[in-house]
């Protein structure tokens, strides 16, 4: 290591997916053929980096996620070889797979090495066999039995292999027999390297207290004489070692704290020291040239060390092959005026494939007929496959046309877009009933369909028109007053569980009371649940989205490590995934609750089963008792004989629940008295039952699944008594008798609902739904059950028998929720009286940035009250571009619309002495990649949203959202232009009585046009706003837009008081049609910004393109004002309350009142 050696570069290992967090590198290695550095991660992915700049070159998923991390990487002239616990994989350096090897006896691979033959490798691990693999053929050529568990391998004069007990074996390179063995370290070998005749090892020894500690010595062995040499002292703890590739006696030794020592093994007193800036080092690797050193640390970074003037990885490297530069296509003058035959067709000399003769067309590979689901429960295993009795539903030798069956499979027909309905209504306004009938033709989602009763259980999918999601008719899927949740959001498979938690009154109360506290932690899942539950209640049947909550859920490293995120569900059933998410949600709720109330037992009383676990050694009878509290109980099933299931009372749901709470199991465990593993008995004793009993169905065998098929097996109510440390559980007639007898200590639980997995093979992929008895959480005192199906945004009422029937093979229960009967209808809204409004009256910043000078915080005298008007405007940036599918006919279908992120929030006073003065002007910290700042329209520039570089006041999304949520629940009335778009992107639901949208105030009933704020400002006040600045880095000012919307509202009030609203609107639209609804040029120069698509009649300046509708007679759901004088504006709004559209507008010389 020369004097100028230092850290040259530090890069994070790329995350496993675009929305994931960086992960640590489980192994790193320098390529000895090309100028590449390779790294593997814990998701089975290997990534390469090119040159000293570590430019990302290739990234390949080499092993399934379920196999865990990449353990080691080796290099061959033909490619790169990697291993995980259960497979060996080889790729080319460009990322193409060469071969992939698995074997029944490959269970836990740890290491590999080349043998004496350069075209063969040997792989080993903590298993009973080693395997020799031919690299050229990609096959296993030999299997070798071994008594040792090997964790590391290095090849030199011998094949040096380290065991998991701290020994190092020198193996023969020919037959792999043990030539010599050393007990190198007391506990384990952490790292080792061999080169020439020397072997150096680092490892751990056991302290007197029993915990391992890094040895302060690096052991050295002579492979020529097979004898140990004097060790190398390293007081910081020798954790990692690498031999220099050129200097045979020089070694790099490193500690876990980052201390590096370059030492001569023959002269330990001659050494050089360096200190790497790491919190915890995970490994080092030296390049074949000896001029570069890579360090892997626990903060997911890879550091590159070396001399800036000399660094290179290999002395002679093959040229790295990069992707070919795509030639630019020739310029073609493509316009409607140019005939297509001018372009011409390529010359051909053979017959075209499109002219394939019809007599050579054959139908092959017809899919087999599906198995009748009614016979699946009766299948029995045979010598080959399974068999069952013939149900005799078809004729003998009858053949089914499976292709025709697949093409005529009934599906849930998507409704027409709202814009299509609006156009049809304008053409045929006298037949609204016919239009509704046409929209609903072919499918019904409530009740039993004539074609297929399973349609309501199908996957539902949002279709997008050019106007975005607001053009989709959600009311087609939901005619109830309960809101559904949208899909097309990462991890939206949890929608069903979130709906279930919302309808449990006690959990709903906890979440809302917590959200009303001073908690502003970004990762607080309980706050996000409170916001979501409040939004679902205020929506009153309109569709909602759990964007903010799911974004918080995705940010948890624990959720990613446990494989709970959508990207990790490839090899995992949805049933087991949602049960794991249920455990995670409730555990995280408990942590979030204790963050504000650490000493409160309220959460334990409501959710936790207070219990203790006793573990008794069956040999010495020693017993250990420890707490065994749990938030979720897993059902445990005994051995089941279906012939006796109906008559055997031990197989009733109540008895299985009792055995699950008082679980008892036998297994082997460590006994500190016997000082060995002994057979032990674990028994759980419950001391207090919770108010909310959450259960995971845990169906893990066909026998357990058949138990649920018994009609009425799942009761709608159960009774539990804790008596003398035992749990007694009752159901059915037994429970009714004890209720009549007023049994002391009896706790009655009602079934609130359940989450079920729906897996209908002919109805797309598996998904989750929830069945919920909404009467439990209703505010009206009623005892009749009202069961509803929640299938994402499809919500419909079902009867109790259908909800609790599981004799269909495609419907399986996953999560159950019971609540004490005393808490029925206990919907607590007192949290609104205890809102912590501190956030509205004090500054909060991530970067101590300075807000705009005009912003003045609210004073105590200005505390908002119900009806207080505030002006709102927001700005957004693009996080993802729209995904568009171009069909064969050239038409385009929007598969997924663009995704926006909140970037700025401005809120102004709407009344008082400081009317129009902002009291909130926050820029939002955005952690996701931003694909477009849309500076011209948002005014947001690169760096504005980064707390490290932004000159503005930066706050987390949670803080900005909570401020708006507080204003909403304080009863403020929001004034703005195109508020529907702002509210949707902020992900907040505002009742119609609390919105004043100037887009609807200045709307003419007979005009198919929504006027832009820019045009209205000129038309009413003769003022120019949103003008194109001289500097392209400038853009809209949200404070200016909010203030203009406020002024327009005030002016509209003047028009109403004067009774001239109709006259004003007529004049505005008459003059606007002459000017194209744009302000005239200032001084003859056009200065108005024009968004793309301004030629379209239905537009939206607030960033939300939605259609308008000419039918305004039934405008029941448009935004309105809180004043009685705004009845006319209600009549001017379109149905569904979601239409808003930009127009580019202009007109009019000012108010006629002047």
From Swiss-Prot:
Q: Which portions of this protein are annotated as coiled-coil regions? A: none
The chemistry this enzyme catalyses reads:
Exonucleolytic cleavage of poly(A) to 5'-AMP
Provide the protein name: PAN2-PAN3 deadenylation complex catalytic subunit pan2
Task: Give the organism the record lists.
Answer: Emericella nidulans (strain FGSC A4 / ATCC 38163 / CBS 112.46 / NRRL 194 / M139)
- Keyword Repeat annotated: yes
Q: Locate the USP domain: which residues?
A: 452-821
EC assignment: 3.1.13.4
Q: Provide the family line.
A: Belongs to the peptidase C19 family. PAN2 subfamily.
């Amino acid at each position: 290591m020369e004097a100028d050696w230092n850290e040259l570069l530090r890069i994070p290992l790329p995350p496993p997916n675009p929305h994931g967090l960086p992960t640590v590198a489980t192994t790193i290695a320098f390529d000895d053929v090309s100028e590449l550095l390779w790294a593997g991660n814990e998701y089975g992915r290997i990534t390469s980096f090119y040159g000293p700049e570590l430019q990302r070159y290739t990234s390949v998923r080499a092993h399934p996620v379920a196999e865990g991390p990449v353990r080691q990487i080796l290099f061959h002239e033909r490619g790169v070889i990697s291993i995980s616990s259960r497979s060996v994989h080889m790729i080319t350096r460009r990322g193409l797979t060469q071969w992939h090897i698995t074997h029944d006896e490959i269970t836990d691979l740890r290491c590999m090495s080349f043998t004496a033959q350069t075209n063969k490798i040997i792989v080993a691990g903590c298993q009973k066999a080693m395997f020799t693999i031919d690299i050229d053929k990609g096959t296993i050529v030999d299997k070798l039995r071994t008594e040792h568990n090997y964790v590391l391998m290095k090849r030199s004069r011998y094949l040096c292999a380290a065991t998991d007990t701290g020994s190092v074996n020198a193996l023969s390179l020919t037959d792999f027999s043990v030539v010599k063995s050393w007990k190198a370290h007391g506990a384990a070998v952490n790292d080792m390297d061999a080169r020439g005749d020397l072997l150096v090892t680092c490892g751990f020894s056991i302290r007197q207290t029993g915990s391992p500690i890094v040895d302060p010595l690096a052991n050295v062995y002579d492979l020529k004489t097979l004898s140990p040499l004097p060790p190398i002292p390293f007081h910081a703890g020798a954790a990692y070692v690498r031999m220099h590739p050129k200097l045979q006696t020089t070694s790099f030794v490193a500690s876990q704290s980052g201390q590096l020592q370059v030492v001569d093994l023959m002269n330990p007193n001659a050494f050089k020291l360096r200190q790497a800036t790491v919190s915890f080092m995970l490994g080092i690797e030296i390049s074949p040239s000896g001029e570069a050193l890579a360090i892997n640390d626990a903060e997911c970074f890879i550091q590159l060390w070396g001399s800036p003037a000399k660094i290179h990885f290999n002395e002679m490297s093959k040229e790295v092959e990069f992707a070919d530069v795509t030639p630019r296509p020739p310029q073609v003058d493509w316009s409607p005026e140019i005939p297509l035959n001018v372009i011409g067709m390529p010359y051909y000399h053979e017959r075209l494939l499109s002219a394939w003769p019809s007599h050579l067309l054959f139908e092959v590979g017809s899919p087999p007929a599906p198995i009748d689901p009614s016979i699946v429960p009766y299948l029995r295993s045979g010598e080959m496959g399974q068999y069952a009795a013939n149900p005799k539903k078809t004729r003998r030798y009858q053949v089914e046309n499976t292709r025709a069956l697949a093409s005529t499979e009934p599906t849930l027909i998507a409704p027409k877009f709202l814009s299509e309905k609006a156009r049809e209504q304008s053409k045929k306004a006298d037949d609204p009933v016919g239009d509704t009938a046409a929209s609903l033709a072919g499918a019904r989602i409530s009740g039993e369909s004539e074609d297929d009763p399973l349609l309501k259980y199908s996957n539902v999918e949002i279709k997008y028109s050019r106007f975005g999601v607001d053009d989709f008719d959600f009311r087609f899927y939901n005619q109830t007053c309960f809101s559904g949740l949208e899909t097309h959001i990462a991890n939206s498979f949890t929608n069903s569980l979130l709906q279930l938690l919302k309808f449990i009154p006690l959990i709903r109360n906890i979440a809302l009371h917590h959200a009303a506290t001073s908690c502003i932690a970004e990762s607080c899942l309980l706050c996000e649940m409170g916001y979501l539950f409040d939004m679902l209640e205020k929506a009153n049947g309109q569709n909602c989205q759990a964007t903010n909550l799911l974004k918080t859920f995705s940010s948890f490293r624990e959720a990613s490590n446990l494989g709970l995120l959508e990207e990790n569900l490839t090899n995992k059933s949805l049933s087991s995934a949602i049960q794991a998410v249920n455990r995670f949600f409730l555990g995280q709720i408990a942590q979030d609750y204790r963050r504000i109330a650490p000493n409160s037992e309220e959460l334990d009383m409501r959710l936790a089963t207070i219990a203790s676990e006793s573990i008794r050694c069956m040999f010495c009878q020693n017993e250990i008792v420890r707490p065994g509290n749990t938030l979720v109980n897993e059902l445990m099933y005994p051995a089941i004989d279906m012939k006796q299931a109906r008559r055997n009372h031990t197989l009733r749901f109540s008895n299985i629940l009792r055995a699950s709470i008082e679980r008892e199991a036998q297994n082997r465990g460590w006994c500190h008295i016997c000082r060995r593993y002994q057979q032990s008995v674990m028994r759980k004793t419950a001391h207090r039952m919770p108010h909310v009993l959450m259960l995971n169905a845990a169906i893990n065998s066909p026998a357990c699944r058949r138990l649920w098929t018994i009609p009425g097996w799942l009761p709608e109510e159960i009774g539990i008594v804790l008596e003398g440390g035992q749990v007694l559980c009752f159901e059915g007639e037994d429970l009714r008798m004890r209720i009549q007898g007023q049994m002391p200590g009896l706790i009655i639980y009602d079934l609130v609902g359940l989450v079920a997995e729906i897996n209908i093979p002919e109805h797309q992929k598996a998904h989750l739904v929830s069945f919920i008895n909404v009467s439990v959480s209703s505010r009206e005192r009623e005892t009749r059950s009202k069961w509803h199906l929640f299938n994402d945004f499809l919500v419909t009422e079902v009867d109790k028998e259908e909800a609790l029937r599981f004799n269909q093979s495609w419907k399986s229960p996953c999560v159950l929720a019971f609540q004490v009967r005393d808490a029925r209808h206990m919907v607590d809204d007192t949290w609104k009286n205890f809102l912590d409004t501190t956030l509205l009256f004090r500054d909060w910043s991530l970067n101590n940035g300075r807000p705009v000078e005009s912003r003045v915080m609210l004073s105590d005298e200005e505390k908002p009250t119900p009806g207080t008007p505030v002006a709102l405007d927001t700005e957004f940036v693009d996080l993802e571009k729209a995904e568009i599918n171009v069909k064969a006919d050239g038409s385009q279908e929007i598969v997924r619309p663009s995704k926006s992120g909140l970037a700025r929030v401005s809120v102004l006073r709407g009344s008082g002495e400081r009317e129009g003065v902002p009291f909130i002007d926050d820029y939002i910290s955005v952690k996701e990649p931003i694909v477009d700042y849309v500076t011209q329209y948002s005014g947001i520039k690169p760096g504005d949203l980064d707390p490290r570089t932004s000159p503005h006041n930066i706050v987390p999304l949670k803080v900005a959202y909570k401020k708006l949520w507080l204003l909403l629940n304080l009863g403020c009335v929001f004034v703005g232009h195109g508020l529907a778009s702002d509210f949707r992107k902020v992900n907040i639901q505002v009742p119609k009585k609390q919105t004043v949208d100037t887009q609807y105030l200045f709307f003419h009933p007979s005009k198919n046009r929504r006027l832009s704020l820019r045009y209205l400002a000129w038309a009413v006040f003769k003022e120019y706003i949103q003008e194109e600045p001289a500097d392209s880095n400038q853009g809209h000012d949200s404070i200016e837009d909010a203030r203009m919307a406020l002024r327009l509202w005030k002016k509209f009030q003047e028009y109403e008081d004067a009774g001239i609203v109709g006259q004003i609107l007529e004049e505005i639209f008459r003059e606007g049609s002459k000017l194209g609804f744009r302000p005239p040029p200032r001084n003859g120069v056009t200065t108005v910004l024009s968004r793309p698509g301004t030629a379209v009649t239905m537009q939206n300046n607030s960033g939300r393109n939605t259609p308008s509708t000419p039918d305004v007679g039934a405008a029941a759901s448009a935004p309105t004002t809180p004043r009685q004088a705004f009845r006319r504006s209600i009549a001017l709004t379109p149905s569904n309350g979601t239409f808003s559209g930009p127009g580019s507008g202009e007109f009019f010389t000012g108010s006629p009142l002047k």
